[in-house]
Amino acid sequence: MDKAAEQSLRAGQIIRRLRDFVARGETERRIESLKKLLEEASALALVGAKDRGVRVTYAFDPTLDQVLADKVQVQQVVLNLVRNAIEAMEQSLRRDLMIGTERGEDGMAVVKISDTGRGIAPELAGQLFQPFVTTKSHGLGVGLSISRTIIESHGGRILVEPNPSGGTIFRFTLRAVSPEELQDAH
């Protein structure tokens, strides 16, 4: 029991430090290719997924590619969401994972990661981004809390909703860079 309490305290300290770090604005935000960022992060997260019967599809909006982001931080969010999706589909007969982008409101890019896993109980969905809340039998329940901190530090939002075809959809937003801004940057 003492060990579990100790681990919880340690995880809480890690989350607090990350929030402080992000709150101080210590991020390396640059203009990045969203498609490339997503492909690189998902390639790492998808190692072994094919062997588990996961079918992956990509659906990128061709008119939307450049975002203002700290590449490493956002890739950590993608890595976390994709790994969670793969784990959620372990018991599913259909294991479809979709990673895509679409244009959102107010100059935001929307990243969408959907799975056909077991889904999330409605009573848990509202708490999912709180530290130590998890749907897994293992793990600390800090990944989504950290992901929310990262996305909010980028001026975005992260949301969860049921997938109409079964499973879960996570969406997060990042500021898209307009062609005019891109021109001015060069």
In which residue ranges do the predicted regions lie?
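Conserved micro-motifs of the catalytic ATP-binding
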Residues: 24-27, 66-69, 135
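Detector for a conserved hydrophobic position within an alpha-helical segment of the HATPase_c
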Residues: 150-152
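Short beta-strand-loop-beta element adjacent to the nucleotide/active-site pocket used for signaling
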Residues: 95-98, 102-111
